[in-house]
């Protein structure tokens, strides 16, 4: 009977974690280039199989952990499906149709600059003529993106018309100026989210060429389907309530067992 309490409790904890992920998706439904997240669940048998195959800690003393026959949250993953393309007619706005990421020189609050990647192509030209993100981070050219060089910035004439073709080549006054840095990755398991719509390349990840087409005058929205997320929220709410009812039922049964049957 006590096991029933633990099973219901862990189920409620899992639903709460799923709800946290879901609400974050809904909060970023209007964030340019945002990729929604999802969760997976693992049964005791799944976790046991993984543990048996894992020999990384072979021969080491293992601490006692929690063993139960219920379901645990496996992992949180990112869905990289294409988001909707929105037309803005802004000549510095660009969207990617296909797999790939823009490369930017991101500077954190400590003043440290590193190369990060994004699908958010809502760019603008600053007063110095550099192509930057809405947060003021510099957009890199193709060489900078391929070589992870944060100093390979794109500088334009702010007074001349900007034309960008499908390859990302930027023209001004009928002359090729540079090319927007667009790259892809060999394995998306080697990139991690930084904030809401930026990505880091982690150790072991490899940069590859992108086959994405650049669309000028457009931006990519998030790939969050609000209706789907709301349906999931209702399902989670019902599952959470079911867990509460189980706990209440077990609690009432235990109360009768201790206070009534125990007196006999």
Model-predicted regions and their roles:
Residues 1-264:
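Amphipathic alpha-helical polymerization modules
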């Amino acid at each position: 009977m006590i096991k029933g309490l633990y099973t219901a409790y862990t189920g409620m904890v899992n639903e709460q974690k799923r709800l946290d992920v879901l609400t974050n998706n809904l909060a970023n439904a209007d964030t340019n280039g945002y990729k929604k997240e999802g969760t997976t669940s693992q049964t005791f048998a799944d976790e046991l199989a993984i543990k048996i195959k894992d020999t990384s800690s072979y021969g080491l003393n293992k601490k006692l952990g929690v063993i139960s026959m219920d379901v645990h949250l496996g992992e949180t993953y990112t869905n990289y499906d294409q988001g909707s393309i929105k037309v803005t007619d802004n000549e510095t706005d660009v969207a990617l149709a296909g797999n790939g990421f823009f490369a930017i020189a991101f500077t954190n609050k400590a003043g440290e600059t590193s190369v990060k990647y994004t699908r958010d192509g809502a760019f603008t030209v600053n007063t110095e003529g550099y192509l930057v993100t809405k947060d003021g981070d510099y957009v890199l050219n193709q060489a900078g993106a391929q070589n992870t060089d944060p100093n390979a910035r794109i500088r334009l004439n702010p007074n001349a018309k900007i034309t960008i073709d499908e390859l990302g080549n930027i023209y001004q006054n009928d002359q090729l100026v540079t090319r927007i840095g667009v790259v892809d990755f060999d394995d998306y398991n080697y990139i991690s989210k930084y904030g809401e719509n930026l990505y880091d390349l982690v150790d072991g990840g490899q940069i590859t060429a992108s086959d994405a087409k650049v669309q000028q005058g457009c931006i990519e929205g998030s790939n969050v389907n609000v209706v789907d997320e709301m349906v999931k929220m209702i399902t989670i709410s019902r599952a959470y309530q079911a867990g509460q009812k189980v706990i209440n039922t077990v609690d009432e049964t235990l109360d009768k067992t201790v206070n009534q049957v125990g007196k006999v």
